[in-house]
């Protein structure tokens, strides 16, 4: 049953709250506010009772799907279970009730937590300094590329106006580079899914500012030639940027800084167990090697004479990228995750993430086309079997049918270089039984497609909204309600 909009509930004049009669003189709004700030018409608020409003939003909440509801194998998103102890930590009054304008002297606990988080992330990634300011991965990317741009300008290398990105890159990579004023150049992948070294050599030159790379890649493959790639980029005078979206695969085993990366951004809301989805809040810290540290956003939390304080005296800084001290509660949750697991636990996280991905890929390899015959890392990409084309079944149909089995679908049609791609990331927190059941049902969906293709083409059947007009949603997204 489709849920009505809250504006379609209730009736004119119905109130959710009855206020007592006003016992003070009313003052006309124009005597208190400039006329250009006063509404000329009443706001079209819904007129519903408190009970109807509560029921409406509870019904909506029961339609949500998240990691606390079921298996969520959305590739390149690391939808792992988020431990609830982190929520308890973030809710402690010392963290929840502080204000960013408090004096440093009475904010030492919060400042210490941020400082130690910076240090922990630097150790995990092999970087020398970190900022916690960026509010999400994309803003972290932007911050990292602005740091690279400022660094090159400080050296007088303003002619470096190109950024190289692989054809398997996250879409945010070229978008970020373009937003920073760089020209984006694509480098092709080789037959094994890695960066084509010959193609890279052709692109490198005195006009290249950086190569943006994810390792493991969005294909779920480790870049075997990473040290050679780093050497080539550095020999050409460029910098190597690490998109940390896939760090969950290598913690305790490999560090971007040791591979030759100069700048990294991370996603605390992916790798480090803080909830994400629905627009946030997130956290996208950025780490750099020592020579780029002066350009980090200010303030950076430092320790001096036993005290923790924000350092604003950074004349080469790119400036603030976020008000106050970032999404602080997310940092508290990530700190709790880091300290709960420790170094040994983080290493086991990556072990299990890689094990689960390879186990699931093996389960599906006889039923789907696997484009790269390699051991995967934390995620993998497959394509539907050839006979699905004969049935007129597309990746989207398979994904939609999975909804009826109670799963969130995998990422579809990405990376773009894989035909009809389905990208799975099971994460480390799923059991063997969950993976077995999921594989069984996914294979069952293929059998349904062969027996009755229309069953998939018309799926899903159990969701409140079945199939959106994808073109209209992309070109004319109406996400708000407006009175007729």
Curated annotation (Swiss-Prot):
GO terms for cellular component: cytosol; glycine cleavage complex. SUPFAM superfamilies: PLP-dependent transferases. Its cofactor is pyridoxal 5'-phosphate. Keywords: Oxidoreductase, Pyridoxal phosphate. It holds the Pfam family GcvP2_C. One of its GO terms (biological process) is glycine decarboxylation via glycine cleavage system. The modification N6-(pyridoxal phosphate)lysine is found at residue 270. GO terms for molecular function: glycine binding; glycine dehydrogenase (decarboxylating) activity; pyridoxal phosphate binding. Coiled coil: none annotated. Its EC number is 1.4.4.2. It catalyses: N(6)-[(R)-lipoyl]-L-lysyl-[glycine-cleavage complex H protein] + glycine + H(+) = N(6)-[(R)-S(8)-aminomethyldihydrolipoyl]-L-lysyl-[glycine-cleavage complex H protein] + CO2. It comes from the Bacteria. InterPro entries: Aminotrans_V_dom (IPR000192), GcvPB (IPR023012), GDC-P_C (IPR049316), GDC_P (IPR020581), PyrdxlP-dep_Trfase (IPR015424), PyrdxlP-dep_Trfase_major (IPR015421), PyrdxlP-dep_Trfase_small (IPR015422). Belongs to the GcvP family. C-terminal subunit subfamily. The glycine cleavage system catalyzes the degradation of glycine. The P protein binds the alpha-amino group of glycine through its pyridoxal phosphate cofactor; CO(2) is released and the remaining methylamine moiety is then transferred to the lipoamide cofactor of the H protein. The glycine cleavage system is composed of four proteins: P, T, L and H. In this organism, the P 'protein' is a heterodimer of two subunits. This is Probable glycine dehydrogenase (decarboxylating) subunit 2. It comes from Desulforamulus reducens (strain ATCC BAA-1160 / DSM 100696 / MI-1) (Desulfotomaculum reducens).
């Amino acid at each position: 049953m489709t849920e009505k909009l809250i504006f379609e509930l209730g009736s004119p004049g119905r109130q959710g709250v009855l206020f007592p009669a006003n016992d003070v003189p009313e003052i006309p709004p124009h005597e208190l506010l400039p006329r250009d700030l006063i509404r000329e018409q009443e706001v079209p608020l819904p007129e519903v009772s408190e009970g109807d409003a509560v029921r409406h939003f509870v019904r909506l909440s029961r339609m949500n799907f998240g990691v606390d509801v079921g298996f969520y194998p959305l590739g390149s998103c690391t939808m792992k279970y988020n431990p609830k102890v982190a929520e308890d930590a973030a809710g402690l009054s010392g963290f929840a009730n502080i204000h960013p304008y408090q004096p440093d002297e009475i904010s030492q606990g919060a400042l210490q937590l941020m400082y130690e988080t910076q240090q922990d992330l630097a150790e995990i990634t092999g970087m020398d300094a970190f900022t916690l300011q960026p509010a999400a991965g994309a803003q972290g990317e932007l911050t990292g590329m602005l740091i690279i741009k400022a660094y090159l300008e400080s050296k007088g290398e303003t002619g470096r106006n190109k950024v190289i990105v692989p054809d398997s890159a996250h879409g945010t990579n070229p978008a970020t580079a373009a937003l920073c004023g760089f020209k984006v150049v694509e480098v092709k992948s080789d037959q094994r899914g890695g960066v084509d070294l010959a193609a890279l050599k052709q692109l490198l030159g005195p006009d290249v500012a950086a190569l943006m790379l994810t390792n493991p890649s969005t294909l779920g493959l480790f870049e075997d030639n990473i040290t050679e790639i780093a050497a080539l980029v550095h020999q050409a005078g460029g910098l190597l940027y690490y998109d940390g979206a896939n760090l969950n695969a290598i913690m305790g085993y490999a560090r971007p800084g040791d591979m030759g990366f100069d700048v990294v951004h991370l996603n605390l809301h992916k790798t480090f167990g803080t909830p994400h989805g629905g627009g946030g809040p997130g956290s996208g810290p950025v780490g750099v090697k020592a020579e780029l540290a002066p350009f980090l956003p200010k303030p950076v939390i430092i320790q001096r004479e036993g005290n923790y304080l924000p350092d604003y005296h950074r004349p080469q800084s790119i400036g603030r990228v976020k008000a106050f001290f970032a999404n602080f509660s997310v940092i508290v949750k990530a700190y709790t995750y880091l300290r709960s697991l420790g170094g040994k636990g983080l290493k086991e996280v990556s072990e299990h993430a890689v094990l689960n991905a390879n186990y699931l890929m093996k389960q599906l390899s006889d039923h789907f086309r696997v484009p790269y015959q390699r051991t995967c890392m934390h995620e993998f990409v497959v394509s539907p079997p050839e006979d699905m084309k004969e049935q007129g079944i597309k990746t989207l149909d398979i994904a939609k049918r999975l909804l009826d089995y109670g799963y969130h679908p995998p990422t579809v049609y990405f990376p773009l270089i894989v035909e009809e791609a389905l990208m799975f990331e099971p994460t480390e927190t799923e059991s063997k039984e969950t993976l077995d059941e999921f594989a069984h049902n996914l294979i069952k969906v293929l059998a349904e497609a062969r027996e009755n293709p229309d069953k998939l083409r018309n799926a899903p059947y159990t969701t409140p909204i079945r199939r959106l007009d994808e073109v209209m949603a992309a070109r004319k997204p109406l996400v708000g309600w407006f009175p007729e």
